[in-house]
Swiss-Prot record:
Similarity field: Belongs to the protein kinase superfamily. STE Ser/Thr protein kinase family. MAP kinase kinase subfamily.
Pfam short name (any one): Pkinase
Gene that encodes it: MAP2K2
Stored Gene3D superfamilies: Phosphorylase Kinase, domain 1, Transferase(Phosphotransferase) domain 1
Listed name of the protein: Dual specificity mitogen-activated protein kinase kinase 2
Site entry: Cleavage: P10, A11
GO MF entries: ATP binding; MAP kinase kinase activity; MAP-kinase scaffold activity; metal ion binding; PDZ domain binding; protein serine kinase activity; protein serine/threonine kinase activator activity; protein serine/threonine kinase activity
Function summary: Catalyzes the concomitant phosphorylation of a threonine and a tyrosine residue in a Thr-Glu-Tyr sequence located in MAP kinases. Activates the ERK1 and ERK2 MAP kinases. Activates BRAF in a KSR1 or KSR2-dependent manner; by binding to KSR1 or KSR2 releases the inhibitory intramolecular interaction between KSR1 or KSR2 protein kinase and N-terminal domains which promotes KSR1 or KSR2-BRAF dimerization and BRAF activation.
UniProt-listed InterPro entries: Kinase-like_dom_sf, MAP_kinase_kinase, Prot_kinase_dom, Protein_kinase_ATP_BS, Ser/Thr_kinase_AS
Modified residues (Phosphothreonine): T394, T396
């Protein structure tokens, strides 16, 4: 008699590179998987709505079977970045709408196979704060990663429409990012490695999810050799090449929050004139209420347009930007515009020494997060109004 295998989530039993087919023991196996799924979901401390949505996603995913290039119909392009192009597609056999990321890599078959193997870990990442994964495969020189489609897009796209994102909305974003990072760390021992607005996705149901985290070391290495990715959200210790941990993700989250709150990438910091244009009134800074610095500063590299129109300042070179992150004071939220709780939360994320920087547990218990957890905020309504999306009948509960 064969040793009984440890049961796993249904997502793990669906190998995207193997065609779906009937199994003589599939009924018994599916019952065992259902029991195990329920146990796994209970461990995640989800509310009923989150549990139902996760179960619905996994049920849909179970119908997908093998993923093949010919089975996808392209609908539109969603964006480009991180060395790949993301398109909205329909998977014809299942009828599901997905987001398909295509990454072109000139690599040997052994490396390619290792990347596909490493990406299978994504089948185990089932959380309300992590974008769902359908599978990965290789075809014609490109690796395809097929994910849940989030109809609100990424927060950098939302920022273009919103100009600035309100503090109460960013409270819900902060909760989701912290819970997503904690899930990856505690359940899978994974660091994200690339937290930034374009890797935080939202949808019209009010869900906020992380994507593009560093699950495949081989893919990270291969892309580093093929693409010069942005380093502008990296923590100082990463830029200096020293050891980094989840604390580096905390820095990236803090920097992202300042960008989303102010309306542009915050290094170098906006001067008094720009802050007045952003907030519609003079903004004070410093302990004694002095007007914010009026010294002219260059704009961030490669960013001629902010949420507030064309930026006529000379561009900062990329090496100047990286030097600024390492050697200059960290960015902060201007005084008199945001609550002290939010300002302090961001400041704790942006401490340059990672040993002194707040960790996930400290931030989860911070007053800003505790307040945001109980605050009634219609995130779905705000997003749909901002992006002119149709709001579904059952948005996510406002208290995330």
């Amino acid at each position: 008699m064969l040793a009984r295998r440890k049961p796993v989530l249904p997502a793990l039993t669906i190998n995207p590179t193997i065609a779906e087919g009937p199994s003589p023991t599939s009924e018994g196996a599916s019952e065992a998987n259902l029991v195990d799924l329920q146990k796994k979901l209970e461990e995640l401390e989800l509310d009923e709505q989150q549990k139902k949505r996760l179960e619905a996603f996994l049920t849909q995913k179970a119908k997908v079977g093998e993923l093949k290039d010919d089975d996808f119909e392209r609908i539109s392009e969603l964006g480009a970045g991180n060395g790949g192009v993301v398109t909205k597609v329909q998977h014809r056999p299942s009828g599901l709408i997905m987001a398909r990321k295509l990454i072109h890599l000139e690599i040997k078959p052994a490396i390619r196979n290792q990347i596909i193997r490493e990406l299978q870990v994504l089948h185990e990442c089932n959380s309300p704060y992590i974008v769902g994964f359908y599978g990965a495969f290789y075809s014609d020189g490109e690796i395809s990663i097929c994910m849940e489609h989030m109809d609100g897009g990424s927060l950098d796209q939302v920022l273009k429409e919103a100009k600035r994102i309100p503090e109460e909305i960013l409270g819900k974003v902060s909760i989701a990012v912290l819970r997503g990072l904690a899930y990856l760390r505690e359940k899978h021992q994974i660091m994200h490695r690339d937290v930034k607005p374009s890797n935080i996705l939202v949808n019209s149901r009010g869900e906020i999810k992380l994507c593009d985290f560093g699950v495949s070391g081989q893919l990270i290495d291969s892309m580093a050799n093929s693409f010069v990715g942005t380093r502008s959200y990296m923590a100082p210790e990463r830029l200096q090449g020293t050891h980094y941990s989840v604390q580096s993700d905390i820095w990236s989250m803090g920097l992202s929050l300042v960008e989303l709150a102010v309306g542009r990438y915050p290094i170098p910091p906006p001067d008094a004139k720009e802050l007045e244009a952003i907030f519609g009134r003079p903004v004070v800074d410093g302990e004694e209420g002095e007007p914010h610095s009026i010294s002219p500063r260059p704009r961030p590299p490669g960013r001629p347009v902010s949420g507030h129109g064309m930026d006529s300042r000379p561009a900062m070179a990329i090496f100047e930007l990286l030097d600024y992150i390492v050697n200059e004071p960290p960015p902060k939220l201007p005084n008199g515009v945001f609550t002290p709780d939010f300002q302090e939360f961001v400041n704790k994320c942006l401490i340059k020494n990672p040993a002194e920087r707040a960790d996930l547990k400290m931030l989860t218990n911070h007053t800003f997060i505790k307040r945001s957890e109980v605050e009634e905020v219609d995130f779905a309504g705000w997003l749909c109004k901002t992006l002119r999306l149709n709001q579904p009948g059952t948005p996510t509960r406002t208290a995330v």
